Amino acid sequence: MVRKRIVAAGLVQCVGFRWVAGQNAARLGLTGWVCNREDGTVEMEVQGAAEAVDAFIGAAARGPRYAEVTHIEVEGRKPDPDERSFHVRGA
C-alpha cells in the first residue's frame, strides 16, 4: 500500500475536479480525500495499491473535461491504515 499527496494547478476549480477525483478513487478502490485550496489549486491524498494510485495520478494530470491542468506535484506520504473511504472536502 502506498499513499501520495497530489496538488493540481491550472484551471482546476469549478470544473468538477473534486467530483471526478471521487469517482476515480471509487473506481480504483482508493481511500483518501480531495479539496480546493485558497490558492486555486486542488489538493488530494490517495492510498491503495501502487498501480491504482499511479492510474489516479494519471487521471488527475489529465483532469476532467473542462479542466486545464498546467502542473501537477506528487509526493509520498505515510499510509494511514485506519482510513476506509474517500472524501470530498468542502463540498
PLM regions: where:
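Intrinsically disordered, low-complexity, mixed-charge
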Residues: M1-A91
